[in-house]
Amino acid sequence: MSALDNRLFAKMNGIGNEIVVVDLRDQPAPVTPDDARAVAAHLPYDQLMLLQPARLPGTEAFVRIYNNDGSEAGACGNGMRCVARQMFASTDKQGLTFETRAGLLNCWRGPADGLYTVDMGEPKFGWKDIPLAEEFRDTRSIELQIGPIDAPLLHTPSVVSMGNPHAIFWVDDIEAHDLGRFGPLLENHPIFPERANITLAHIVDRDHITMRTWERGAGLTRACGSAACATAVAAARLKRADRVVEMTLPGGQLSIAWRESDNHVLMTGGATFEFEGRFDPALFARSRDKTSA
């Protein structure tokens, strides 16, 4: 029996990032990686957001996040906006706090209808915090390239942790490189012991960046909120962009503000409800049968 048997789910998207939200606050039984993969086989998604019973006072829930390959993610900005949208629909509160593997995340109703703001916390830059497999004193750019040594296709990325590892390659044209080909190679590069999200980014102006992301554990995605935060921060660290920027992703726009007062990164964007349904227990029974076989 799975904790997801007959459970109600909401299919949503955060500017194109495919999200499934399940409220399990009345269900302490764990959801397994096999369960997460079984859902993905039936209902394709980028992230599965599971609301589990709160573990800390003042929080609404512990949010466990699965990628579609069954691996866990510490943070998912687009997914958290979807969770916030669902929760705000049943409360008059202006702000909500959730616990994730990456720490506490605060969410607010945004500056306009349909927009939500998530405090993604403070970025980390130390090589052990990202983490990297070897020491780099300056993570604004590290020695990593793909392609010929004398003419690399991609090289010297910036690396940042937003509760999950990110590598950002600065390019003139984000469509000129086959991210579907290079993404998995870079995600699984030995320099990243926990794998990494891989982003191609182009700085249009000091307040505007375009980007595409190969998401760790999910693949090519139309949007990755934590990658947008990491990219904005990395550009500001290089002094090539301001601390408040508009990010253009294949799925839409995000506003990112790297606050000077506490170094927290605030992400504002939309969240769309698509439909709801219930999981068929047979879905998870088939998964268990395959595993036991």
UniProtKB/Swiss-Prot annotation:
Active site: residue positions: 76, 224
Alphabetical UniProt keywords: Amino-acid biosynthesis, Cytoplasm, Isomerase, Lysine biosynthesis
The UniProt record lists the keyword Cytoplasm: yes
PROSITE patterns: DAP_EPIMERASE (PS01326)
NCBIfam families from the UniProt entry: DapF
Family from the record: Belongs to the diaminopimelate epimerase family.
Protein name (record): Diaminopimelate epimerase
Gene from which the chain derives: dapF
